[in-house]
From Swiss-Prot:
GO terms for biological process: translation. One of its GO terms (cellular component) is cytosolic large ribosomal subunit. This is Large ribosomal subunit protein bL19. It comes from Staphylococcus haemolyticus (strain JCSC1435). One of its GO terms (molecular function) is structural constituent of ribosome. The keyword Ribosomal protein applies.
């Protein structure tokens, strides 16, 4: 077996199939497993997907939320075992792949229209 085929086989076995399909502009609830010492807990991060990048095992996505008036962005590897589950709350209608312009918008201007 060549190196390329070996890498492809290992990568395919590591990909997760239990995740919903989502796009930029969608609102997600990401349940992340956090380990603190010997304790383990689930932390929920809810926000708008502002970008997706990469492909295969190295694919990542960034979720942005407003917490106490401060914008918080968190980037997650899509296929990591640390993500317990991803819930799709609503689908957003956007015409861009990267929503960096949301960083400069405040309040109602930062809303994204929902797909019916």
């Amino acid at each position: 077996m060549s190196n390329h085929k070996l890498i492809e086989a290992v990568t395919k076995s590591q990909l997760r199939t239990d995740l919903p399909t989502f796009r930029t502009g969608d609102t997600l609830r990401v349940h992340v497993r956090i380990v603190e010492g010997s304790r383990e807990r689930i932390q929920v991060f809810e926000g708008v997907v502002i970008k997706r990048r990469g492909g295969g095992i190295s694919e990542t996505f960034t979720v942005r939320k407003i917490s106490s008036g401060v914008g918080v962005e968190r980037t997650f590897p899509l296929h990591t075992p640390k993500i317990e589950k991803i819930e799709l709350k609503r689908r957003g209608k956007v015409r861009r792949a990267k929503l960096y312009y949301l960083r400069s918008l405040r309040g109602k201007a930062a809303r994204i229209q929902e797909i019916r």
